[in-house]
Regions:
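C-terminal transmembrane helical hairpin of 12-TM major facilitator-type secondary transporters
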Residues: 307-350
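Hydrophobic core of transmembrane alpha-helices in multi-pass small-molecule transporters
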Residues: 34, 115-133, 254, 331-345
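Helix-to-loop junctions at the C-terminal end of transmembrane segments
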Residues: 74-88, 184, 293-307, 389
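Intracellular juxtamembrane helix-capping segments at the cytosolic ends
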Residues: 47, 131-149, 267, 345-358
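C-terminal ends and interior cores of transmembrane alpha-helices
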Residues: 97-114, 208, 315-327
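Cytoplasmic helix-loop-helix junction between adjacent transmembrane helices
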Residues: 122-169
């Protein structure tokens, strides 16, 4: 297999981001990787709507969503390690088959009134079998970047690639829920399960095909040696040192997850109290738009990693504090757009750092650990905000605390770096 060749150019500094994307991977990868992550964005809300529309209790519907989320959180690190050891195409193919089987079980349970625990178990299996397409895609960018012996070019590919993946994640989590809602309206509960299965086969199946054609795309290659050796001189190589460097980044990623979970739950509570529940989805979804745009553009900003993290935390703190005042819908929308920009920049910065620290051959595993931190953060934010209850003014407090925590982490890393330089 030939990995798409990264072409050199004297005008690298003036290359557009879009051109760099296409030169590095080609349009086939961009399309297949995007389609591969859509089922994960669609299935969770889709199952909630399927269960509730099938006449089952809302409590069961919520429990199914929780089962999918917990399954994903527990399964992601295992899936990531399997990707690194067995090859991405094999693991993704196996995960696709398991997810399809789980959807068949859910269809049978819904259509034949089988016990609730069967739906819960199938939902948990679906979550555990999530192929982590986003993490695999990020590992592909890492593999391509490490295949070049031009460090400046490699760094540009990583930054733009991580920006693109964040944009892809955010837009998929806007498109996915909208598509799930449309399916349930058009096809009903049983038809939606069938449609989810077909779309999962198509989306993840196309990604499997791309990965099978480029089978060694995420495996260590001889061409990476020079780039990796350059990185090793500047970054820790022992396991303990890598964990020490990566832990603050994972804390920030989890903090971003708290912002997502808190904001979604708080908006739901506010609009339910105001009698405008239909506004929750569009307003929350708009955060994904600015997150995607800024996430894609932020790698071009000539600002250091810790400064970006601190700036993102400050904006999150200010925006979440503003939302605690329960502003009007228009003002809330403006604040949400700013909040999206902050989390988009922060996520790209963090994922780029995770790639930088990950040892060769373990990039996918590192990315899935980071994604798991984000998922756990979402769950934590939703849980705490839900526990706050009907106090609309305190609903966004967990997100504000998370923003302050990001600033503290950035300052702590900066202080530690300063101490090292003095030694």
């Amino acid at each position: 297999m030939n990995i798409p060749v990264v072409r050199s150019s004297r005008a690298d500094s003036s290359d557009s981001s879009a051109r760099t994307l296409l030169e590095a991977t080609g349009p086939g990868f961009l399309m297949c990787a995007y389609l591969g992550r859509l089922p994960a964005a669609m299935n969770q809300l889709g199952l909630l709507l399927v269960v509730s529309s099938a006449g089952r209790s809302l409590a069961l519907a919520g429990a199914v969503v929780a089962a999918v989320g917990l399954g994903t959180a527990f399964g992601a690190p295992v899936i990531g390690r399997l990707h690194d050891h067995l090859g991405a195409w094999r693991v993704t193919c196996g995960a696709l088959l398991i997810q399809t089987a789980a959807l068949v079980v859910i269809w049978c349970a819904v259509s034949r009134a089988l016990p609730d625990w069967i739906i819960l178990a199938a939902g948990a299996v679906m979550g555990m079998a999530n192929p982590q397409a986003g993490s695999v895609a990020r590992a592909v960018w890492s593999s391509i970047a490490r295949a070049t012996d031009q460090p400046a070019r490699a760094l540009r590919i990583i930054r733009i690639g991580m920006g693109w993946e964040t944009a892809a994640d955010e837009t998929s989590f806007v498109i996915g829920p909208v598509a799930a809602g449309g399916l349930i309206s058009l096809l009903g509960a049983q038809g939606t399960v069938v449609a989810l299965g077909v779309l999962t086969l198509i989306g993840e199946g196309m990604f499997v095909i791309w990965l099978s054609i480029h089978r060694d795309v995420v495996r260590p290659q001889r061409g990476r040696a020079r780039f990796d050796s350059d990185r090793s001189r500047a970054h820790p190589t022992t396991t303990g040192a890598v964990v020490s460097e990566m832990l603050p980044v994972l804390v920030v990623i989890m903090g971003v997850g708290v912002v997502f979970g808190t904001t979604q739950t708080a908006l739901t509570s506010v609009h339910a109290a105001h009698g405008t529940p239909g506004l929750t989805g569009p307003i929350y979804g708009s955060m994904g738009i600015t997150s995607a745009l800024v996430g894609f553009a932020s790698p071009g900003l000539r600002v250091g990693r810790l400064r970006k993290t601190a700036l993102g935390g400050i904006v999150v703190l200010l925006c979440s504090s503003t939302l605690m005042g329960v502003p009007s819908a228009i003002a809330t929308e403006a604040v949400i757009l700013c909040l999206g920009a902050a989390v988009g920049m922060t996520l790209v910065t963090c994922y780029s750092r995770v790639e930088e620290l990950a040892p060769a051959g373990r990039v996918t595993g590192a990315m899935t650990v980071a994604s798991t931190g984000n998922v756990l953060g979402v769950s934590l934010g939703s849980l705490v905000t839900g526990a706050i209850g009907d106090n609309l003014h305190l609903g966004n407090l967990p997100a504000a605390v998370a923003g302050a925590g990001m600033v503290v982490v950035a300052l702590g890393e900066a202080g530690r770096a300063a101490l090292r330089r003095r030694r």
